Amino acid sequence: MSELYTFDESYKRLLGLDIDGVDIAGIKVQGLKNASPMKDILDLSGKVAIVTGGSRGLGLCIVSRFCEAGASVVIADIAVEFAEAAVDYFSTKGKKVKFIKTDVRFLSQIQNAVDFTVQEFGKVDILVNNAAIWKMNKFFDLTEETWDNTIDVGLKGTVFFTQAVAKQMVEQGQGGKIVNVASVAGLSMESSYGLLIQYVAAKSGVVGVSQSLARELKPLGININCVLPGGMVSPGAIHSAPTPELRKITNAHPTVPVTDPDDVARVVFMLATEISNYMHGATVVADGGARLMIQK
């Protein structure tokens, strides 16, 4: 390993940071800690992750990136056929991936997923709350069922999966990483064409919850941060395409970038590694510049 990455005394002096014991504005500065090479920072060997909604689209890309970095992964999803196919695929690659059918609307199933993960792999180090549903509709066409399902999956599931995993992390005493997948729709109604009020409500809630929980979880050694993707090519997007009537509304807006979900998965991956050690309650936008194009 190169001496450059050890922050030895010579390197500290080079940086002008050989300052152990110095008092700055009443804060005792202990100087730089030893640093790890990037290859070690990005290495998830020995880590165990749960990814909700991990059977397809963005979730599957996240699972793939975690596996590539050496993590063991549990897919918590309701799509049995797709999840089992994913497990079979990763097994042929020698990766450790398990699946448990989980409807994140129900706390009992959330706890079952956490217990299953601990039983299979001994612990939980990383949680990615990715499960969500969305459907385009005008406000006057919104039904109670659509509202409840969207909020329960996207917001309630995120809150209570975070609670269950955070309790497990505290019990383990090793801290951990929690990454919540929100959306740029949670920041701007414009980005959702005004046709996703229930989805906007859920994702706005995820952003707020992530920021609020960061204060409580930071002293426990748990980093919780939030990724806000823009439009992605995914099965969910294809199956939720607007009707011809709604298409007239979406076509009236500027064309915005639609990305490969792996572009977003890389950002999620970053927040699940030691790169995010100094990040608490951050909201990281990964929308290909879409917000810049639709702002007036």
Language-model segment annotations:
Residues 179-205, 210-211, 215-219, 231:
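Catalytic loop of short-chain dehydrogenase/reductase
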Residues 138-139, 143-151, 238, 249:
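Substrate-binding pocket helix/loop in short-chain dehydrogenase/reductase
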Residues 3-40, 188, 269, 280-296:
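Short C-terminal tail/terminal secondary-structure segment
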